[in-house]
Amino acid sequence: MYGMDDEGIFEQLFKLLQSSGPVNWNLAREVTKSLAGPQQLIDPEVAEEYRELAHVSEVRISSVTDLPSPAPGELNPTDRATWAAENQQSFRVLVEPLSEKLTGLTDSDSLRDIPELGGMGAMGSMLAPLGPALLGVQAGTMVGFMSHRALGQFDTGIPAMDHDRPYVIVPNLDDFAIDHGIDHRQVRLWGALHEVTFHRIMAVEWIRGRFVELVEAFYETVEFDMSDLMGKLSAMQDPEAMQRMFGADEDATGLLKATSDSSRLADIQAFTAFIEGYADRVVSMAGAELLPGIDRIEEAFNRRRTEPNKAEQFLQEFAGLELERWRAKDAARFCDEVVERWGEDALAKVWDDPTYMPTVAEFSDPIGWNARVLLDESALGND
């Protein structure tokens, strides 16, 4: 494209920026492909080992939890590029609700208020689809970054919307084992246990709907700061700058910045942390007899959650959504204390109703949670 004249570049960009929906998923796919990299072949023997470990995991998990057991989906041991392609829209709940806000900010009336954008020729006709294009860039960048970080669906911190297929991203699990000096076979079993556990949690009938409700409530409070974006648009001196802005490079990661309501953010943080913390506890119990190195694996994984990474930093900057996944450790301690005080059945009550999930404050106050959930329910039963 760089060899074309200005009008040729604009024509190509115009085609890429076209979208019939709130998000330009064609542009998202291009950005994701660029970031995820080329496909890698997965050793068939390793893939088969993962599938066998998933069957072992199903049996072990059934022995330690009453979580619903959906029809087991075949575990997909895959590479980064394939995972990214098959999950391109799995996290659309984090992007699509923002389209209405952007529509108001990028309509023709708003853009006419920017003197520097006047008289820019072909660029003016490209600004109409700016909102869907911006969201496409953000969606593609988010999934592209995730593909290099996530160990499986369980390690995204976010329920997938499009499908129920369990995945492990083999190169990332291999890197995790190497980075922490842990036996590959133990990491593979641990990864399979986590993915199967997450798959079961996602089978709770209200889980995905509740997450959507929390995200939509949170996004009602999000306000975008468009100054950086408009500054880039007004400062453009050539068409290649426009091309770079919608490419998979550092220019794309800071197009939008958002502020949001901290209390509604805490609701999402509690939701995702509890799912991860509960899963940690299940995996720890299910793998105790099979994984002599489970303490090292869990320590490394918890430490990893506290480390900054591009996917989560991008999500925080783009939408103001900071998951604070390190809270999973607090949630796991909450689970342990509830079971110690009131038994496994008390903890299992969480899955009966979305309002029974603990808040961030209740992670350190299980007695308060008990008073809100268990005692209130007991009182209702005696009426």
Predicted regions and their residues:
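Active-site recognition of the HExxH zinc-binding catalytic motif
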Residues: 187-203, 335
